[in-house]
């Protein structure tokens, strides 16, 4: 890996300051991957998002409606983290697939095994009234092959727009990956929001999270065009090909790889119920607790030693097979 000196990572898509033409040959590269990397990616992004809402006084007393949540192993960590901070949250986890048994038996967690449609969304809104709703969506439909088609993506994004319109959440975190320009069908609309980049995404993932906080006005929509798709592809390829393969030499941390640098800046914003002498100590504590929870071996993190014994994930099969499958260089995940 090449070295670089950086003041901060790219946290949002708009911050990426360069671009690179996509090279199909990159598909032949062997990707480095951590165990349970998909759950790690989701956990870090959602912990950052919910901590941001906590900082704004939005989180306490809310119901998190998570659509497309299975297997949801990482959600147990999120639930326990905020529960231990004394933040009152209810969780409604909805997916047509079954959830990890680690989520069973929790009074503040409701598990629903079904897919959503407009009628069911209206019933959720009626059931939860007058509670404030925080929406997290990780919907993903694939009608064939390993990757969702552009038609699949457009269907998912139309459904996410309906979720916002009906549930009227105070905040949302939506799945977002722009269709590739060579697979373009038509222009479409997504909610206006901040496009958060994700550490520990697969090597050439073009996916990000669309974060929004709503202040009472109608949902603002942004039109996405083929020209936008070209911009997304070039900037995300630059991020994945060049930036994420760097070692950050001025980053004082046991592992100086860019994704750990990115993770550091996310975890530094997270509240804890104990004090630490430095921000670095807090981030190390959080990272180690997350890696232990997800059973990610300490050998994957350089120079982190003296870890407590890791707990076992309830079942190796609790992780969706689709999340562990080999993906194309322009991965949706």
Swiss-Prot record:
It holds the Pfam family PARP_regulatory. Residues 169-249 are annotated as: Binding to NPH-I. S-adenosyl-L-methionine binds at residues 39, 66, 68, 72, 95, 97, 116, 138. The keyword Metal-binding does not apply. MRNA binds at residues 22, 177-180, 182, 205-207, 233. PROSITE patterns: SAM_MT_2O_PK. Residues 305-333 are annotated as: Disordered. The active site is at 175 (for methyltransferase activity). The keyword Transport does not apply. Its EC number is 2.1.1.57. Residues 169-333 are annotated as: Binding to Rap94. It comes from the Viruses. GO terms for cellular component: virion component. GO terms for biological process: 7-methylguanosine mRNA capping; methylation; regulation of mRNA 3'-end processing. It is found in: Virion. It catalyses: a 5'-end (N(7)-methyl 5'-triphosphoguanosine)-ribonucleoside in mRNA + S-adenosyl-L-methionine = a 5'-end (N(7)-methyl 5'-triphosphoguanosine)-(2'-O-methyl-ribonucleoside) in mRNA + S-adenosyl-L-homocysteine + H(+). GO terms for molecular function: mRNA (nucleoside-2'-O-)-methyltransferase activity; RNA binding. Belongs to the class I-like SAM-binding methyltransferase superfamily. Poxvirus/kinetoplastid 2'-O-MTase family. Interacts with poly(A) polymerase catalytic subunit OPG063. Interacts with OPG109 and OPG123; these interactions might help linking transcription to capping and polyadenylation. This is Cap-specific mRNA (nucleoside-2'-O-)-methyltransferase. It comes from Vaccinia virus (strain Western Reserve) (VACV).
